[in-house]
Amino acid sequence: MTILSTITSISRPNKISKSFVSSNGGSSISMGSNSVACYNACGGGSSYSYSSSYSGSGLDYSYKANYSSSTGNNSYVVIASSTCNCN
């Protein structure tokens, strides 16, 4: 996990476009939690769109960083592609 800690910084352009992911046990992906993460990341009041696409299996997935507002910790989960656009 120490290697993955180097990917936590994400640029913040005027119109934010980021990847947000959430999982249970680091393997199964939860759409509901993803939507909550997207809502929180957009400030809780901004409108947003959310989309996901998955491919591959096991180690073919890429690792992304996810910040959990409930625990205050960063966790690393397995996803293929997940994007949140703040309007």
From Swiss-Prot:
One of the GO biological process terms: sorocarp development
Name of a matching Pfam family: Coiled
Record-given protein name: HssA/B-like protein 57
Species per Swiss-Prot/TrEMBL record: Dictyostelium discoideum (Social amoeba)
Gene (UniProt): hssl57
Highest taxon, organism lineage: Eukaryota
Entry similarity comment: Belongs to the hssA/B family.
